[in-house]
Amino acid sequence: LPPNLVECFYDITNADRKEWFCTSDPKDRKLGSGGGTAWLLKECIENDSDNQQADWQQNLPSWLAAEKRILLHAGGQSRRLPSYAPSGKVLTPIPIFRWGRGQKLTQNLLSLQLPLYNRIMQKAPSSLHTLIASGDVYIRASKPLQEIPEADVVCYGLWVDPELAKNHGVFVSRRDNPERLDFMLQKPSVAELGKLMRDYLFLMDIGIWLLSDRAVELLVKHSVKADGSIGFYDMYTDFGKALGDHPSIIDEELNSLSVAILPLPGGEFHHYGTSREMISSTLAVQNSVIDQREIMHLKVKPHPSIFVQNTKVEYKLTPDNQEVWIENSHVGSKWQLHSKNIITGVPENDWELNIADGVCIDVVPIGESDFVARPYGFNDMFRGDITDDN
């Protein structure tokens, strides 16, 4: 998790400390998804251990074998989704689905992710104890899960067009053996995928990986440096590209791991990585069921891409207000909103504001009575030189 969320996570979510453990990456170095996995395992093993001086790597095999666990990577800085950077994207509040039953007004990205991950773990063979997933996606499976084969690594993917696959990791399998990984690519070009389609099938990586204890131990081994510290190691480019029948990275130990690739039945992939994706993904989820007999929420919004949660809005929204997200805020009658506006955390006010297209406002409480306003642009990336206007 982000460092500021670790200590208050249990209070915010009412999570049981016996069921949940959270930590953040060290502040002095970047670890990547592989190194971050090793760090999370190390921190959790040491937290569980009565002997803090014990070697966590020696305890790793027995600890892994003890029970099944879900590892969720949600520690990003959320630079492209500033509205939920303080709490982490994984706690982004998600509007109830107009077609959904059993929804909660307090639901967030984390609570929506877990049911699928739990179903997968219940279905997984007894040899697979570890599931690793990303914290900034919502993945749905509208159909029952297939049987999960015995393998050191089992990865789920989606059938997608090359145009979408080019932005993600891709599992490539031979047409005569579609469940067996031949090799993995990272962000391949459309032309590259086009050349493969005669003899190969490809699935987009959706970030759900099941690992055997042996696979986890090798992932950790490659993440730990000679001095015993954990360094940068990427699970997808470094570890993933060493998997399959014809891997691009030659490593005898990793090359020997057996790998199975499964298409997620009725799968949907919704990314919550940016401000735009937060709205577009939520809209896509709302529209995943269009049968009016299944839709229980009968109110028609001025525009489908308007989302209002836990908010007092005295300003009249219109069809011109497109890609608008208002949460935990007071928007008074003297406000004027346009499009691509994200308003979060605004306290009760009597302000007269004209929020231009693409302007977003987040307000963070400081101490008992103070607030800090954080204006930003809808498409701001918050990267590069601080003096750069972009």
Give the label of every model feature segment:
Residues V6-Y10, G76, D182-K187, H246-I250:
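Short, functional N-terminal and low-complexity linear motifs
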Residues L1-H129, A133, Y138-Q146, I386:
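N-terminal glycine-rich phosphate-binding loop and ensuing alpha1 helix
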Residues A74, S134, L210, H271-Y272:
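Alpha-helical architecture
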Residues L71-L72, L81, M184, W209-S212, ...:
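Conserved catalytic-core segments centered on acid/base and nucleophilic motifs
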